[in-house]
Amino acid sequence: MLRAVSFVGNYAEKVFLHLMYLTGITEHEWYVDDVEFNYVYFREGRYSGYELKNALEDLSRLSFARIRRYPLKTDIDTIDEYKDYVESECDSLLLFYDGGYFEFYSKDVDTLHTIFKFGVENGFERIEYVDDANDVRTWMHF
């Protein structure tokens, strides 16, 4: 079963912008954490879609972030392991690290195909699907 799409994307701000629009940025709530390893301050916590949209430029300056997407008015779950993610209300989870590596997990296979296609069309490097057989990640943090 498909779990994610991983890739290297230059120009993080542009990548974030496109990912957020492809996944309906304003139609969801977002939770940003795992930002403590950065040289630039970014507020950890819950964001409306509009708040996150306005913070994309600052977000792109980070080296590490975990961004989770939730349906509106949903409680934020504790997600440590992949199993927690699967059992949570979170429908997508983006791990961004080292300033250009992205792992986009989604429970919606169509979303994964859309992001993969977009990545290929826009020259993302090392783009690949992550599935049950090749996903080595169990811990959904850095």
Language-model features: where?
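Generic structural motif
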Residues: N10, V35, Y70-K73, G99, ...
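Surface-exposed polar/charged interaction patches
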Residues: L22-I25, L62, N122
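Short, surface-exposed beta-edge/turn micro-motifs
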Residues: H28, C90-S92, G99-F102
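Surface-exposed, low-hydrophobicity interaction/linker segments
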Residues: D33-L94
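Acidic, proline/glycine-rich low-complexity IDRs
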Residues: F96-F142
